[in-house]
Amino acid sequence: MAEGFAANRQWIGPEEAEELLDFDIATQMSEEGPLNPGVNPFRVPGITEKEKQNYCNILQPKLQDLRNEIQEVKLEEGNAGKFRRARFLRYSDERVLSLVHAFIGYCIYLGNRNKLGSLRHDIDIEAPQEECYNNREKGTTDNIKYGRRCCLGTVTLYLILFTGVIVYSQTAGAQVVWRLPPLVVPVEESEIIFWDCWAPEEPACQDFLGAMIHLKAKTNISIREGPTLGNWAREIWATLFKKATRQCRRGRIWKRWNETITGPSGCANNTCYNVSVIVPDYQCYLDRVDTWLQGKINISLCLTGGKMLYNKVTKQLSYCTDPLQIPLINYTFGPNQTCMWNTSQIQDPEIPKCGWWNQMAYYNSCKWEEAKVKFHCQRTQSQPGSWFRAISSWKQRNRWEWRPDFKSKKVKISLPCNSTKNLTFAMRSSGDYGEVTGAWIEFGCHRNKSNLHTEARFRIRCRWNVGSDTSLIDTCGNTPNVSGANPVDCTMYSNKMYNCSLQNGFTMKVDDLIVHFNMTKAVEMYNIAGNWSCTSDLPSSWGYMNCNCTNSSSSYSGTKMACPSNRGILRNWYNPVAGLRQSLEQYQVVKQPDYLLVPEEVMEYKPRRKRAAIHVMLALATVLSIAGAGTGATAIGMVTQYHQVLATHQEAIEKVTGALKINNLRLVTLEHQVLVIGLKVEAMEKFLYTAFAMQELGCNQNQFFCKIPLELWTRYNMTINQTIWNHGNITLGEWYNQTKDLQQKFYEIIMDIEQNNVQGKTGIQQLQKWEDWVRWIGNIPQYLKGLLGGILGIGLGVLLLILCLPTLVDCIRNCIHKILGYTVIAMPEVEGEEIQPQMELRRNGRQCGMSEKEEE
């Protein structure tokens, strides 16, 4: 074949034609590729030998010119060796291709790349020597640049994979801790709860909430017995009472005067004292008595600090109680409150008893009845008084009005009242402090507006049948000679007038103090003088306990009080603290546990058969504990933005719910709907104190499942009984209780690490130093901060645009050209904008051990 080729040197065959056309393209090639991209017809896929011969016949003149151009190259000129350059670029492409195959793991290519795509001839020629290129010939091409990046990325990837394998092997035996699991458990009786009240009509319970949305969800979970909200009834009642009167102490001043108090010897020896007397606006106190203190306002009690309420009746979880009528003063009638029959088990004296210490009567068939009774009162007054000049309206002239004098001793006042039904007060309890003796009843009476009187509401007390012996206790009944009892008739007959009086004060015990509220001035403000009438206005939900009375069959009789009537109600049975406690007994205080130790089997558990899905309802009030529990203001303000928060966190809820994979946890009590109020209840507050400790233990505030390294787990001698899981046949209470000790120990470990962590102390010190350095920023006005920040932001954006725009444009251009199948290069600069008539190809270097003629 070699002899035939030498015999006909003028004819150019397909093989030589293919190389000459490659040279023609390479003469205009730079680092970025050919200037005018062309297609070598001899390299078209699927071309046959016949087609190659036809191309040789057609392109023979062009091929002859290309051969002559190559042969006329002069050695002494410094033109770039285009042909050598093209061969180097071809080899560099193969290097990049080799790196790509190494990156994807296709190592067979590295061994067979020299055999792929090469045409082999069995000819008798000398073996070519290895070619050498200097750095100037090589330059820095795009292939070299991206090849280096590819190599660096490959090494980094394998390093990361190797590190991940090592980390996984080290943490395979780690203990799993579930932070803030979606379940609730009862609180301890020793825990402190933070609460606040809310009532839309009451300023003392409305100044920080605005509108309340009761977050509730139905659930069927079983919670073991724990403390209820009734355990804190006395503390809640005392706080509500202070709230009711706090507004009045900050109100307007009704009267002010100065008085001089003298001592026993007059003003001698500086025993005189000048006292400034300030009487506040009694209108405020009277409003409190008319509305809140007497329970005419519905009040909801809401917990803060991450605690929740579990209603044992409705099986619901919520932050707030249902609206309750909470009278803060003793009353004859009140909200539903039952009494207890077994008096031996009653430890709290405030709880009403259904028996009595000195009576043989037995009350059974007790039931709650609404107060379908009305009281009518008519006030009459003798007429001593005086004429008063008043202006009735701007249309009329001044006129004289008769105003009776109610302060005169000559004035005779009567306030008879009657009931619409018989009321028998069957027993007596220790009600008000300084209680009225005898048979008595009290109620609220409403006076309509008239020409001479304004609309008002008074508290009226009626008393009759007072016992004559004050050393004995007035007792309802007519059995004589009862030890320590003064028998009185406690029946208030219908349509019978009884002498009553306006209650101008009441006495309450707040904390350990007995406080007397004198309402005389407040009553005077409503113009009680004259003749007027009123009708009781008991709330519709109020009533009394009506019982049947049966005398005991005990043979020992005559020394105990028998039934005063066959039916009766319990007089003064409503005690505010006891009533509040009974209303709150149905609300169990629960919380979301901070940690739950989870066996590894739980995370890997696969149910054998399809089970019912566990629906987790997530109501988002995430800042309840952050808002400052117990401070009062804005403690539950997040509830008003519930809908906005729900829309914002909906995507996060779905991701977290999917990540928990609760369907794999076959807890008996968790196969129903469970409510989690807040994804991170108190998480932010706890993280502030346990950040460094949790970091050392392998957790952060954004993780719900944390794998504590086994080394740390064994260092603190913590073990978990893997058998408690029992393949999922465990209740919520059992799981929590069996790991409760470990949870407490885990919390103590966190506190111990936090207090003794050197890194934590160092971090705090560095934070303080940084704060000292940047403290001057706080002295800059706000508008200057905004202006400076805007200028820096714009400048940084322009700088990044200048630096990154060329690279971005080149990247986009290269991607487009790669998709099209070729690469466009830039035209080489030519001085004088004139193209040389003849572009000669020169070698910038020489081939190792080979002359120029031999190379050609």
From Swiss-Prot:
Listed disulfide bonds for this chain?
A: none
A Pfam family reported for this protein in Swiss-Prot or TrEMBL: Env-gp36
- Which residues does the annotation list for site: Cleavage? R611, A612
What does UniProt say on post-translational modification here?
Specific enzymatic cleavages in vivo yield mature proteins. Envelope glycoproteins are synthesized as an inactive precursor that is N-glycosylated and processed likely by host cell furin or by a furin-like protease in the Golgi to yield the mature SU and TM proteins. The cleavage site between SU and TM requires the minimal sequence [KR]-X-[KR]-R.
Q: Which UniProt keywords apply?
A: Cleavage on pair of basic residues, Coiled coil, Disulfide bond, Glycoprotein, Host cell membrane, Host membrane, Host-virus interaction, Membrane, Transmembrane, Transmembrane helix, Viral attachment to host cell, Viral envelope protein, Virion, Virus entry into host cell
* All ranges on the Cytoplasmic side of the membrane: 807-856
Ranges of the Extracellular topological domain: 1-785
An annotated GO cellular component of this protein is: host cell plasma membrane
Q: Which GO terms describe its biological process?
A: symbiont entry into host cell; virion attachment to host cell
* Region annotation (Fusion peptide) ranges: 616-636
Leader sequence residues: none
Glycosites: 220, 258, 269, 274, 298, 330, 336, 342, 418, 422, 448, 481, 499, 518, 531, 548, 551, 717, 721, 729, 737
Q: Which GO terms describe its molecular function?
A: structural molecule activity
Spell out where the chain crosses the membrane: 786-806
Subunit details: The mature envelope protein (Env) consists of a trimer of SU-TM heterodimers attached by noncovalent interactions or by a labile interchain disulfide bond.
Q: What function does this protein fulfil? A: The surface protein (SU) attaches the virus to the host cell by binding to its receptor. This interaction triggers the refolding of the transmembrane protein (TM) and is thought to activate its fusogenic potential by unmasking its fusion peptide. Fusion occurs at the host cell plasma membrane.
Q: What is this protein called?
A: Envelope glycoprotein gp150
Q: Which gene encodes it?
A: env
